[in-house]
Amino acid sequence: MKKKLLLIFIIASFSVFSEQIVNLPESNIKSDYIEINKMKNTKNVIVLEKKDIQEKGYKDLSAILDDIPSINVGKSGWGDIDIRGQGEGSSAKNLQVLVDGAPITTLVNHPLQTNYNIVPVENIERIEVIPGGGSIIYGSGTAGGVINITTNLKRLSKLINSAEISIGTKGEKYSLAFGHKLTDKITLQLSYLRDNKDLYFKDTYRNSDYFTAGLNYKINDNQNLSLRYSKLFEKGQFVRTINYQKFMKEKKNYVPEDRKVTVGLDKDGHKIEEIISGYANADRKFESINLSYNLNPTKNTKYLVDAFYNKGNFSNTNLGNQVMYHHTYGFKNKFDIEYAKSTSFEGSSLLLGFDLYKQDAKLEYNDYKTLNYKKKTYVINPLSFKYNKKTMAFYLLNTLRYANFESSQGIRRDYTYWGFDKKAAKNKGNEVSHRHNTNYELSLGYNYSDTGKIYARYERGFTSPDGLEITDDFSKYDIKATRGEDEIYDLYEIGWREYLGFSTVNLTAFYSKTDNEMSRNYILDPDLGFGRKTINILKTKRKGIELSLSQKLGKLELKESYAYLKGKREYNGREGEFVNPGSYIDWSNSGLQKVPKHSLTLEATYQFTPRFSSSIRYSYSGKYSNFSNIKDKEEEGFISSYSITDLSLNYHHENGITIYGGINNLFDKLYFEYVGSRMYTVVPADGRTFYMGIKYKF
């Protein structure tokens, strides 16, 4: 089926060759961020504009990203975003997520996980995805890539006044935005959104309130100051995973059994127990404040500083009152210098940067230690897991232009101080691990015509341990920082961009390798029993192709995107120091675990009239292996491919009213966002859903 659809798109493109109207390629779209503008000429940057994501039935950021072929959301773990086939166990830490340039990447993903659905779809102006790399600007965790979400608060010079209501089979939304010019130099933007989501299973939901406020002060023609505030408050309950057999029997009517939890001890030391719902708690809070200052001291220089502060908490568990609190604050400085004016190197520039920020997270709850087994008496054993990570970095990115050539050379020095204060059930410890790394980048691009470009780039980056790996060195009484090294990756990328008469083409091929990948291996401690220890005994290679095409053929617009991802993991020669030969893994050659080899998205939009249009989108996700060890192949097997078709309609009236609607998963396909080991547990995706809405801009 997928081959036929792709063939239809290609034939249609050639058959109307004479009706060519070519779209701007993504590389020519100016970013709101100076660093991305410098990177995108010799790097594949995927850009999704507001018009690409709004009024199309996307329920959240995860749904938007999952339609990008090189990204998989939820396959490698609940809430995980996997870019360029990192696979299970690696995707969460090989990722950087930013909102308006400020980092919100989760510091620790154990034992509680979360997702990145912080900003509602209605408040997103643009999403920029940098697949693989970006380490000169963003530092650790960019092996998979970077996602930068630009909200309506970033563009305070463009005021928004609107009201919107949307309803559907999965809930309803109400939003209001108000912008006003207070003076010739000061503008104010406010917005509020209420989102009531009905989830897959009976009595499951996520209801949220999202408020934003922004103030922009244009000091003069060369200076600008903006202050932005946002707050998300979310409540709900949901089912994290469900047994596959139970799901096939009960489907959407499944209700998890109530759970008995201990909430304290009485005066005699006996447990006080309560019965709570078996649903996972979806409560979450997220609050952020951002301050940006831009200064143009001269015609050839720019200074930009972004200060940020955010805090919040989440649970996403059915284990009781366990809550993870997190907090990030700091600033990013950028100083850009254009040089070589009126010379052969005109257009060259040097970007200098200094980053300083700190992230912390904590989880605290009570455990109950047996005092007398026969009398069933206990004592409270408070557990505490506190993490903090301080990052200080200096970098420079030089962009050199000469005739039709463009080259970038970058270097970044990172100083990371990874600390923890941890009290577990049987041991404790606190320590700070000092980790220093240097990243490099070198690229060369050549504009061989007015419409065509080829480029090649090399990048060296690193990934530091996550919150769980950093404490993977313990004894009977102590917890110490891991002796595992930071992972080092080498990325090679070549690209081609062109207008082929009737179509834009953006083709990228990449190869990356990590020779010291971290692995959490089981160890047996005589007192603590089985545990894990982080050691660098693996090497992993990943390769892939990313292709995107677009055509404008009269009233018909076509878009095609495809990704091929393949990885291979094996031992690097150090396994003998740590692992018993009898425990060696016979690594599979069928690709990394939970990474589809082929992914495809096709979209057609037809403009019936200047005001009325309709779109149909087809998404295909290929099969993938659910195992790493060849001996598990028969038991774990492969997870089947699936395809989804979405339909949307949109009508714009001249008085500012937009009416839209559509059907997602048109053919009501049953598929799973996540499949656990041996397909024992699954997370089902939504079936067919309907939606419609009306928006008024005033």
For each of these PLM feature ranges, what is it?
Residues 401-405, 416, 510-514, 533-630, ...:
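Gram-negative outer-membrane beta-barrel transporters
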